[in-house]
Amino acid sequence: MAVIQVTAERTVNAPAEAVYGYIRDMHTHPKFLPPAFSDFHIESGGVGTGSVTRFKVTAGGRTREYHMTVDEPEPGRVLRESDQNSSLITKFIVDPAGSGSSLVQISTTWQGAGGIGGFFERTFAPRAMRAIYEDELQRLDAYAREQQTA
């Protein structure tokens, strides 16, 4: 089994502190999730470390359910979601990028399957997930811009 990693990043036109706040607030986060995400529920907490969420992601014709626990290894910069039922871990990294903007990276890793199924997973899953994350980052940028003018 090989580790599979998917990463996408984008400059978001809002200060890093504000963007990190949108990401860590599980009540706000669904406002910029793309349609591939569904059935988003907050089971406990709701803001940052200790929050537990449940949602589904449809990619490549498959729908998977995730049960995520949130922690903040670097509060204000890195938020991590760990699936309680698999090896999947997603990190959101937010860094200042100058002129009131920020660079946001979404990175997910998991242990891929072995055999022929693992070959297809390693080949197709990263492409599908990267497209979903690029859409999420675009939506995050639009949401952040909207909040800056509100």
What is the meaning of each model-derived region?
Residues 1-44, 139-142, 150:
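Hydrophobic ligand-binding cavity/cleft-lining segments
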Residues 7-11, 65-67, 89-91, 107:
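Well-ordered beta-strand positions in beta-sheet-rich domains
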Residues 12-14, 59-61, 74, 110-114:
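Beta-strand elements of well-folded, non-transmembrane domains
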Residues 40-89, 103, 135-150:
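Glycine-rich portal/gate segments that line the openings of hydrophobic small-molecule binding cavities
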Residues 82-135, 140:
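Beta-strand/loop substructures that line and gate deep hydrophobic ligand-binding cavities in soluble
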